[in-house]
Amino acid sequence: MGKAKFERNKPHVNIGTIGHVDHGKTTLTAAITITLAKTGGATAKNYADIDAAPEEKARGITINTAHVEYETPARHYAHVDCPGHADYVKNMITGAAQMDGAILVCSAADGPMPQTREHILLARQVGVPALVVFLNKVDMVDDEELLELVEMEVRELLSSYNFPGDDIPIIKGSALAAVEDRNPEIGQERILELMAAVDEYIPTPERPLDKPFLMPVEDVFSISGRGTVVTGRVEQGIVKVGEEIEIVGIRPTVKTTCTGVEMFRKLLDQGQAGDNIGALLRGVDREGVERGQVLCKPGSITPHTLFEAEAYILTKEEGGRHTPFFTNYRPQFYFRTTDVTGIVKLPEDKEMVLPGDNVKMDVELINPIAMDKGLRFAIREGGRTVGAGVVSEIKK
């Protein structure tokens, strides 16, 4: 059978499997494709297909990630699965594979383990909006009470990280039974129940087009007789000719009007998410705008200097630092299109950060940057990437 033609008339959702090593994330991913393939909603993939995840680069960091796609009657899904724990940390922090929701896989035989906890914390820090739980390997637990105990433990753990532990759907089953097409009452029937829960519980993300206009400034030109043109790729939303917009970040915020939009040397009446455009700005001189600022819908985003972040620091082998760093470390933080120097403050209990660590830290920038929770950045020293991070909370 050739590659299935996916109808793009359904809402699209990005999802992933998270959880402790060997609890069955990859087996579950295979089980979903094998189960949905029966009704033509997927191409069946086995464990080995998914486990041999190709390398990709995101923000200068190499990550192994497997991508599969499938559909339910309600939606089309792109699903990511990572072979190693470090790949999950890097993936979630860089946003290489943006997740609109995740399936937390937890072995019923072991209950929550250290990486179960860490992945839930990461999901909270990087802003994964919703989780659904698959309690796997139920055939290895013959005591119903023990199963209920593990479920309670998972719910308490979710609640402790501010997820709605009491409301999150928990489906109990065996991914292996589904892959091997046996014991449907714990196998494929449970996979269908899981997908129904994912359909219902994980919200459809807002499309980039529906969000407020935002365009990072890449370049600025002065065109004689016409004014100042700012070029860049529209990240989200729509800008129409004649609309008032703001220039935010680095310097005090300025209001201006977009008096023209051009793409490929043609004049348009609007630019939208995904377009590489030149925007003509009224009454702004070439010195009034610089790379690293953003054009946006007025009031939709504000400039900040102090924030909390979750960061991953590259190992020496990944081309990162060879030595640890301490509080008052001063690297560059690369946001969208520019570097800004910032000062790092580590949590009280963290004396130093070693290459390969992921860490929560406070950063104070020397210039304000337009930011929201969830904004990704790279940490650089002299143009070389030494880490990646995501804004988890804005403080000032």
From Swiss-Prot:
Mg(2+) binds at T26. The keyword Metal-binding applies. The keyword Nucleotide-binding applies. PROSITE patterns: G_TR_1, G_TR_2. Residues 60-64 are annotated as: G2. Residues 19-26 are annotated as: G1. Residues 136-139 are annotated as: G4. It catalyses: GTP + H2O = GDP + phosphate + H(+). Residues 10-206 form the tr-type G domain. GTP binds at residues 19-26, 81-85, 136-139. Its EC number is 3.6.5.3. Residues 81-84 are annotated as: G3. It is found in: Cytoplasm. One of its GO terms (cellular component) is cytosol. This is Elongation factor Tu 1. It comes from Hyphomonas neptunium (strain ATCC 15444).
